């Protein structure tokens, strides 16, 4: 009998939201995504101990400056883990730019190019990499410039329609609109204990973005992310891609039956309007309390986990 994970694979590209190679081998996704939080978790796994040691040793050879060594070791480790993962999947690995650069377009471009170079030095072509960038105004501008250089991007921490519109207009390859974190905010703000999957605010948000992209002929890939339960995944079956944690992949694999296609790619019927200006984007974000709060929180959390990872590396660099 078919299970819901197998059924989902027939209608949506399944991506693993983890840095755990054993989980990736088990569920056989097409792509995989990482972020600073997942890298921090992965760095604690015994199978990655040698990668940390190698990154530290390599960084020491690149510079005598302690802070530069830390930056180099961090970048090298992210790429080393990405390379390991890329050997277990047919598709792409997403590696994230330091969240502390989220409001600096030039620095984001520089870091992205550095990560791509390290991947290419490790024998991984840039066609197999997506550079993850927070969906700030500055991040979206960086992504537009990188796309023109042939470096494809995954715009993350996306909570609002304005962010999605700006990404499409910038010609970004892929966006990761968050589902579960939107649900978290609404549950807390409204006191609502639970939502039916089709009424889940995160599901509603991704559905609106998906339909807008398809109606207007945008090529940007929509990859739903950050799920709290399989009901959200079931309600978005048919989305271009869904990036799912190992725990929820397991739940889907244990759920018998087929999934109904919920999102369908209808032919474009509308012409895109004027591009969002920076002031329009910032005003739309200001008017969206949920998106503003969750974007800021997401950047802070990723930055904090990056700093925890660096603390581990700093200790090893000084040993």
Swiss-Prot record:
User: In which pathway is this protein known to take part?
Assistant: Carbohydrate degradation; pentose phosphate pathway; D-glyceraldehyde 3-phosphate and beta-D-fructose 6-phosphate from D-ribose 5-phosphate and D-xylulose 5-phosphate (non-oxidative stage): step 2/3
Sorted alphabetically, the Gene Ontology BP terms of this entry are:
carbohydrate metabolic process; pentose-phosphate shunt
Query: Which GO molecular function annotations are given, in alphabetical order?
Result: transaldolase activity
Active site residues according to the UniProt entry: 132
* UniProt keyword terms in alphabetical order: Cytoplasm, Pentose shunt, Schiff base, Transferase
Q: Where located?
A: Cytoplasm
- Supply the EC number(s): 2.2.1.2
Q: What class of enzyme is it?
A: transferase
GO CC term, one of those recorded = cytosol
UniProt xrefs under Pfam families: TAL_FSA
Question: Where is it mainly found?
Answer: cytoplasm
Per its UniProt record, what SUPFAM superfamilies does this chain match?
Answer: Aldolase (SSF51569)
The reaction(s) annotated as catalysed by this protein in its Swiss-Prot or TrEMBL entry are: D-sedoheptulose 7-phosphate + D-glyceraldehyde 3-phosphate = D-erythrose 4-phosphate + beta-D-fructose 6-phosphate
Q: Does the keyword Cytoplasm apply?
A: yes
NCBIfam families (UniProt xref): PRK12346.1 (NF009001), talAB (TIGR00874)
Oligomeric form and interacting partners = Homodimer.
* PANTHER family membership: TRANSALDOLASE (PTHR10683:SF18)
Protein name stated in the entry = Transaldolase
Q: Which organism is it from?
A: Alteromonas mediterranea (strain DSM 17117 / CIP 110805 / LMG 28347 / Deep ecotype)
Encoded by which gene?
tal
């Amino acid at each position: 009998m078919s299970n819901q994970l197998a059924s989902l694979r027939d209608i949506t590209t399944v991506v693993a939201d983890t840095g755990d190679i054993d989980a990736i081998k088990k569920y056989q996704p097409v792509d995989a995504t990482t972020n600073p939080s997942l890298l921090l978790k992965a760095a604690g796994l015994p199978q990655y101990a040698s990668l940390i040691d190698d990154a530290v040793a390599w960084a020491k050879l690149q510079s005598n400056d302690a802070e530069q060594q830390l930056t180099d070791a961090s970048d090298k480790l992210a790429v080393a883990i990405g390379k390991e993962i890329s050997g277990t999947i047919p598709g792409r690995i997403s590696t994230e730019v330091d969240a502390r650069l989220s409001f600096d377009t030039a620095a984001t471009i520089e870091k992205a190019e550095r990560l791509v170079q390290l991947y290419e030095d490790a024998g991984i072509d840039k066609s197999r990499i997506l550079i993850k960038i927070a969906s700030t105004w500055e991040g979206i501008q960086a992504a537009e410039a990188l796309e023109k250089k042939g470096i494809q991007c995954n715009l993350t921490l996306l909570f609002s329609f304005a962010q999605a519109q700006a990404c499409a207009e910038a010609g970004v390859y892929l966006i990761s609109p968050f589902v579960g974190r939107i649900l978290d905010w609404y549950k807390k703000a409204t006191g609502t204990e639970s939502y039916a999957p089709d009424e889940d605010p995160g599901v509603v948000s991704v559905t609106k973005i998906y339909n807008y992209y398809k109606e207007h002929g945008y090529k940007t890939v929509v990859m739903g992310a950050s799920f709290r339960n399989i009901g959200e995944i079931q309600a978005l079956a048919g989305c271009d891609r869904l990036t799912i944690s190992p725990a929820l992949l397991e739940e889907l694999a244990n759920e018998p039956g087929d999934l109904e296609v919920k999102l369908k790619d209808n032919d474009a019927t509308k012409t895109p309007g004027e591009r969002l200006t920076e002031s329009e984007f910032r005003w739309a974000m200001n008017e969206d309390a949920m998106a503003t709060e969750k974007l800021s929180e997401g950047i802070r959390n990723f930055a904090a986990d990056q700093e925890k990872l660096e603390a581990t590396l700093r200790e090893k660099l000084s040993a």
